[in-house]
Amino acid sequence: MLVCVLQEDQMMKLFLTSSPIGIYRSDEPLDYSGFNPDNGMVEALKYFWVDGARCLLISAFPDEYSVNDRMRKDYEEIVKDTGLSLSCMDICDSRNGKEKADALHSYDFVILGGGHVPTESAFFARIGLADRFRGFEGIVMGISAGSMNCARIVYAQPELPGEAADPSYSRFIPGLGLTDYNILPHYNAVKNDVVDGLRLMEDITYPDSFGKTFYAIVDGTYLLQTEGSAVIHGEAYRIHDGIFEQICVRGKAFSLTDGELIPKPESPGSLQAGM
């Protein structure tokens, strides 16, 4: 079995995360600095990382300049605290969106920030981001909404008051087309949420899953997609045709490519080895 197929260096490495730096809606102190090392994510990042990487953070809040400036500094420190070397951490928002999108291929690591899915999607469309990603060979990390917007067709799960009850709200919208997998983040925190009097999962998401497949993941879990391989690392659930089932647990890996649970690799180098 293959945990991840790495036949070539020159291809996009896509990390779809829920939260790579903490637990959503939790004030509990972290026992690590930098990115969450759970389920081998830091090891995998280090395996793909290039020294002195040029990094770009694309904001989900394109008009919140002061927030974005602070976030840029925070992620610069997070990368450093993880033990990854970088030469820059730039921000992309409404001040420079098209300029940074045009320069996308000059970066080695691109973060798609978390926030409100439709708002972020509209910004991505405005700067032509989907086209700019064509042929990109670096690392892309989606965070929450950023992971959701990576899909070819995005499931914009209702989140804000009014969205579930509004018949004009679009639940399926065009995405970046980096993956065909629909990620639902923060399952640990939102599984009991209620939006407009409807249970987020049972009354909204399950019915929306008919003819679709969603993957609900908890914070610390991630999907790693490379050429010919897509593997979920950590606790995850599949929602399809209204049926909810757990497919993976913490410390294990599940191949979406092969549809089977597989052992967790002992080291990043074992990603290249078949068993």
Spans of features found by a protein language model:
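C-terminal and late-domain segments of enzyme folds
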Residues: 12-50, 156, 160-275
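Short glycine-rich anion-binding loops that position phosphate/pyrophosphate groups of nucleotides
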Residues: 115-117, 146, 188
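Charged helix-capping and loop-helix junction motifs
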Residues: 71-73, 124-129, 197-200
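Short, well-ordered alpha-helix to beta-strand connector turns
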Residues: 52, 107, 136-137, 179
